[in-house]
């Protein structure tokens, strides 16, 4: 079977996008082929696969699969690319655009340049702060500065769900963090029944932070939109940051705004290349 695809990225968070309006590629196919096609040495290379599909509830639907084939509820960087692809390719010319996800229907405001989408602001919806609903095994709301011990050192995390679980850890020196070891330990800790994403954050000032990301099922990535949204919420509810922040991720910058119990994320969406691969 020959499969046409488009490689795109949002702040370096790169996925293989499949237009299921044209391609006969199913959810089961995505689960099977994501570990194969996402391999950076033997295939296309990406953080995973995102399907762009018809929706009877919104303008378009997205389904997102991690590097290991597991499915996630939402991807903040991915949804910006879905909006760009759908608008640029004429699937939907609505602005704002409604996109169906496993988290629900989210709205994307499109900012154009030369008649194509340049940047996208996503209404990421309300964060979930109830411990058992994130989910964690901790019956507390909210979970702020919760201690956890790794290699005889205590770290403190704030738990937030943006449709997928996040553990946000504020640190003094982001550069020298052992992201792989700590991230893997946190991801698979029994505190998180569905595993978790982990964000390591260094505060520059109340309106500016730096972030590194350990994504559930993918490992360290250059960016995570839901993670950046969780960082915005965690920083604000813990009193560390204001409700509007500039977040510097390894793959680029995002602007986050937390107001009226909703998180808004604005950033770029970019094409990498297109191709056809034989499965």
Swiss-Prot record:
The record marks 166, 215 as: Could be important to modulate the pK values of the two catalytic cysteine residues. GO terms for cellular component: cytosol. Substrate binds at residues 13, 66, 76-77, 164, 197, 215-216, 225-226. The active site is at 75 (proton donor), 224 (proton acceptor). One of its GO terms (biological process) is lysine biosynthetic process via diaminopimelate. It is an enzyme of class 5 (isomerase). Its EC number is 5.1.1.7. It catalyses: (2S,6S)-2,6-diaminopimelate = meso-2,6-diaminopimelate. Signal peptide: none annotated. Keywords: Amino-acid biosynthesis, Cytoplasm, Isomerase, Lysine biosynthesis. One of its GO terms (molecular function) is diaminopimelate epimerase activity. It is found in: Cytoplasm. Pathway: Amino-acid biosynthesis; L-lysine biosynthesis via DAP pathway; DL-2,6-diaminopimelate from LL-2,6-diaminopimelate: step 1/1. Belongs to the diaminopimelate epimerase family. Catalyzes the stereoinversion of LL-2,6-diaminopimelate (L,L-DAP) to meso-diaminopimelate (meso-DAP), a precursor of L-lysine and an essential component of the bacterial peptidoglycan. Homodimer. This is Diaminopimelate epimerase. It comes from Brachyspira hyodysenteriae (strain ATCC 49526 / WA1).
